[in-house]
């Protein structure tokens, strides 16, 4: 029998890197095409007019304009009102 306990005594002390999720541009703000509007896990906010959705569900502007957030059929949408 070993006199001392094997290595790995500490079970805590780990933490994941921050993911910086959330709304990056709020309603009423003017944006240019390609601007990131929302970073999210899954589609809690869906893309509306002139808004695209990346493979990691990031919403981005497809055209220059003003950002609006609204609800349709119980679903939150982000849209761009083009200039």
From Swiss-Prot:
Q: What is this protein called?
A: Large ribosomal subunit protein bL27
Gene label? rpmA
Concerning InterPro entries, the annotation shows:
Ribosomal_bL27 (IPR001684), Ribosomal_bL27_CS (IPR018261)
Q: Please report a single Pfam family linked to this protein.
A: Ribosomal_L27
Q: What is the lineage of its organism?
A: Bacteria, Pseudomonadati, Spirochaetota, Spirochaetia, Spirochaetales
A Gene Ontology biological process in which this protein takes part is: translation
For this protein, the parts annotated as crossing the membrane are: none
Q: Name one GO molecular function term.
A: structural constituent of ribosome
One Gene Ontology cellular component term attached to this UniProt record is: cytosolic large ribosomal subunit
Keywords, A to Z, come to: Ribonucleoprotein, Ribosomal protein
Which SUPFAM superfamilies does this entry report, sorted A to Z? Ribosomal L27 protein-like
UniProt similarity note: Belongs to the bacterial ribosomal protein bL27 family.
Please give the superkingdom of this protein's source: Bacteria
Q: Which HAMAP family match?
A: Ribosomal_bL27 (MF_00539)
